[in-house]
């Protein structure tokens, strides 16, 4: 009996995980315009090639490769400023040594 309950539980979890239920009712999905330019150019063409599961990930707000690359390029600024600040003390040390050589 316990084995049957475990199998039913695993089956229910698998069906839930692999189901492609939409957040919108089916009637709203049919009324929505479709095609490559339907979302005003917001949905990239690579998403259409990945199938319906990717559409649901898009609805959930998960990012694809173009957005991830853009996010990585945004994150370059802060640590570059920290590195420049870290090299400032090295420059100061070099200038101090040069000043010491000029004064006997």
Swiss-Prot record:
Region Disordered, residue ranges: 22-49
Pfam families: Gastrin
Entry keyword annotation includes RNA-binding: no
Modified residues (Phosphoserine): 96
Keywords from the UniProt entry: Amidation, Cleavage on pair of basic residues, Hormone, Phosphoprotein, Pyrrolidone carboxylic acid, Secreted, Signal, Sulfation
Coiled-coil residue windows: none
Alphabetical list of InterPro entries matching this protein: GAST (IPR039236), Gastrin/CCK (IPR001651), Gastrin/cholecystokinin_CS (IPR013152)
Phenylalanine amide: residues carrying this PTM: 92
GO biological process: G protein-coupled receptor signaling pathway; response to food
MF GO annotations: hormone activity
Residues spanning the signal sequence: 1-21
Keyword GTP-binding carried by entry: no
Residue stretch(es) of the prosequence: 22-58, 96-104
UniProt function note: Gastrin stimulates the stomach mucosa to produce and secrete hydrochloric acid and the pancreas to secrete its digestive enzymes. It also stimulates smooth muscle contraction and increases blood circulation and water secretion in the stomach and intestine.
Name of the protein this chain belongs to: Gastrin
Gene for this chain: GAST
């Amino acid at each position: 009996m316990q084995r049957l309950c475990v199998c039913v539980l695993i089956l229910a979890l698998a069906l839930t995980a692999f189901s492609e239920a939409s957040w919108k009712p089916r009637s709203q999905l049919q009324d929505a315009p479709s095609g490559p330019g339907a979302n005003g150019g917001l949905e990239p063409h690579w998403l259409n090639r990945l199938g319906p599961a990717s559409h649901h990930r898009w609805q959930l707000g998960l990012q694809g490769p173009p957005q991830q690359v853009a996010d990585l390029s945004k994150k370059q600024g802060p640590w570059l400023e920290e590195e420049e600040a870290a090299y400032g003390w090295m420059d100061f040390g070099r200038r101090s040594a040069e000043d010491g050589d000029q004064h006997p």
